[in-house]
Amino acid sequence: MDTTNNTYARSISSNGNDNFPTPDWQFNGSQLQQNRKSKMNGRSVTNVFPNAFSDAEFEQISMPELNLKRFNPTTLEENNSDLSDMSSWDYMMNVPIRVYNDADTMDPFSLDTIPDSSMDMPFDPLASDYGNAANFPSVPSSLGSNHQFITTPPVNGSNEPTSAQTNHIITANSSPSGNAGSNASASMSVPPPLTPSASTINDQPFSNSFDLPSQVIADGTGAISDINGNPFPMNSPPLDMEPLPSISMDASDSVSEQLVKDASLPSGPFSTDYLENGSDLKRSLGHNQKSDRVSKDVSPQHQANPSTLNNPLKTQNFDSSKNLYTDNKDSSLVSPTGLQSRMEQNPEVRAHPMKDSATSTALRRSHALGAAADSLLPQENSAQIYDGKDVSMVNDNMHSDVRQDSFNKESIKQRIPSLSPPITRSYNAKHRPSLVLGTSVNPHSLSPSQPPVVVPSNTTISSSPPLTSPVKTSANIPNLLPTSELDSSNAPHSQSAATHDLNDVKSYYNTRSSHSVVPNPTNQKVSITGAAADGPNGSAPVDTTPTNSSTTATGAQRKRRKFKFGKQIGPVRCTLQNRVTGEICNTVFSRTYDLIRHQDTIHAKTRPVFRCEICGDQRHFSRHDALVRHLRVKHGR
């Protein structure tokens, strides 16, 4: 509209001679009505209001529900003393004003209670249209109407929808509007909450390295479960189901072979809804103990064992408990032996039957992982012969109870409760090539291109890391680590033993590459600084590099100076006597200038004490620069 004529209308109304009256507009419910008539002093409407509608246009835009009355400027009004001073342009601005009549009953969680048709985006972040960047469903606006959205609360009383509510719908009930004769209702779908309630989620015993949406759950085999209305489908079995048929353990078969025969594996993690009901599970276990069918399936070997009789589920089929994943604390793969130990600790896990939909997939995964683990171990053909040489004569540092050709059943039963998953493929421990030295070196660091370290008997080795395992020697391998208390009598014997062992090692590693050469101990010169070394314990580090004695000693001393600067023997030392204690000062300085300044100030042998002339004898200084600073700061000189 053109607002330039507003000034002209105000000038007419402000003129005292014209007495231009203004009508009185007031609210009546939700409508604006004209209560009084006024006169225009013979002026036409087009002269005062050039932009006013004509009668035909007014009839077109007016609605019968509004009950608007046409303003007649020629009508006279006698009593207009109580009229408010309104501009002639203001009452023509028929602007709808929203009135919240039912403000107390508004839903505080629905901010857009009266959505306007001109709104492009809603203010409700929970609406699906907001997430899809679409327009909000339009509802006709009116005067005094309150389109209040009524949300349906969940049945369980929580703020989050349950899994049974497949379609999350919020209906908007709109009251009859003042200027519209129809009821408006809008329905919008709300997505499930980002964080579901704890009652609808099972404890997942594995961790994914990637983030999944809230509707996608991966089972134990890595497959994505079906996505339907329920984002968390967990088909928990009933508690009163029949137990699985038991199996009998043959005494002739080993535990590992019996576990390998049973190849059916579950597909997903265990459901916590079934494990939480401890009382029902105990009752079901007690019922299983009294059943005759379970007692008949128990073999005589297990009947003799009281622990097996107390818990007959130990002999059940391992289909119900053999899972690829363990509890929440351990997400690694478990071998059948380690799984049996976990089953003995948790009897509830064994009683949980799992579906066999992904048995083949899980079995293939387990076989692939077992093959990958076996590829890291030495093969059977390379057990006795390592790199073309027979190493069965080489003794091992392991304990004697481990050195046996095959693990018997007793040792397997003793190793079952171990926390770490055991290796499914066992091989002879003594066939592993051991180190020549009896030190605690990591056996995994021994590679075909890395020869063993041989040190002659006249060399003392001081290792920086402490020994973590005791050194075990045997009659076949002499002691190559003599201590400092060795006398000169056994030195030739040790030297000959070391030479003989060195020849064996050379013959063993003669097929290696040409760049790996074992150093000759006869050409190795080891220089050790004397007992007068200035260390804390009187010991000095040993450098076994084949260099000269003077070079090694100088390098070791230079290294100590670099890393032990505070404890080094400096180039200059103060030998003057301290006047207070009467002892030698022995202060070490790295520069001669620092030593001279120290002697001139602390000991004051060459220069007198500097006194302040202004302060007198009260202030005296041992250094001249201190006196100059005092005069500048205190006295302004």
Swiss-Prot record:
Coiled-coil boundaries: none
Compositionally biased tracts (Basic and acidic residues): 279-296, 345-355, 404-413
Location in or out of the cell: Nucleus
Low complexity: compositionally biased ranges: 172-189, 455-471, 544-554
GO BP of this protein: negative regulation of mitochondrial fusion; regulation of transcription by RNA polymerase II
SUPFAM superfamilies attached to this UniProt entry: beta-beta-alpha zinc fingers
Highest taxon above the source species: Eukaryota
CC per GO annotation: nucleus
Major localization listed first in the record, in broad terms: nucleus
C2H2-type zinc finger span: 572-603, 610-635
Region of interest (Disordered), ranges: 1-41, 145-164, 169-207, 221-363, 404-427, 440-558
Disulfide topology: none
Gene coding for it: rsv2
MF annotations from Gene Ontology: DNA-binding transcription factor activity, RNA polymerase II-specific; RNA polymerase II cis-regulatory region sequence-specific DNA binding; zinc ion binding
Name of protein: Zinc finger protein rsv2
Polar residues compositional bias, start-end: 196-207, 298-344, 472-498, 508-527
